[in-house]
Amino acid sequence: MIDGDGFRPNVGIVICNSHGQVFWAKRYGQHSWQFPQGGIDDGETPEQAMYRELYEEVGLTKNDVRILASSRHWLRYKLPKRLVRWDSKPVCIGQKQKWFLLRLECDESKVNMQRDRSPEFDGWRWVSYWYPVRQVVSFKRDVYRRALKEFAVIAMPFKERKFKRKGKKG
């Protein structure tokens, strides 16, 4: 399902723990890391898609997490031209994402990335809240920054909320 502007509806998932750290997952067979995410199927709400993706990619259920927030708006990123499949109809030029902030409510030992026949991830770790903004693939960086900025007031202790971009003074 691709919208009229060429963007595929998708959900992004930020899972936090009680220390303000976030769940950071290693892409299967690669050296890149990202938050769990996935497409919204026809007839599915963003929340339903989030729970489905959470189970498929991380092995957690609705009972293992609590929704703390969802993004107010769809956040978009364009794919680099080299990743666009120009021969597909309609052409998908990027993703528009509804983001969810979840708190892990169960023991982290319940994380199971091998539930699906084609796992998305083969490793994970807890990282500091702003770490993903500088580590994710460059074309997703602005969306990550915007989602984390929106969720910071909920996810982080007050003194750690501010994110400073490199090269800016103040």
Curated annotation (Swiss-Prot):
The gene is rppH. NCBIfam families: PRK00714.1-1, PRK00714.1-3, PRK00714.1-4, PRK00714.1-5. GO terms for biological process: mRNA catabolic process. This is RNA pyrophosphohydrolase. Its EC number is 3.6.1.-. One of its GO terms (cellular component) is cytoplasm. Its cofactor is a divalent metal cation. The lineage of its organism: Bacteria, Pseudomonadati, Pseudomonadota, Gammaproteobacteria, Vibrionales. A motif (Nudix box) lies at residues 38-59. Accelerates the degradation of transcripts by removing pyrophosphate from the 5'-end of triphosphorylated RNA, leading to a more labile monophosphorylated state that can stimulate subsequent ribonuclease cleavage. PROSITE patterns: NUDIX, NUDIX_BOX. Belongs to the Nudix hydrolase family. RppH subfamily. Signal peptide: none annotated. One of its GO terms (molecular function) is mRNA 5'-diphosphatase activity. Residues 6-149 form the Nudix hydrolase domain. The keyword rRNA processing does not apply. The keyword Hydrolase applies. Keywords: Hydrolase.
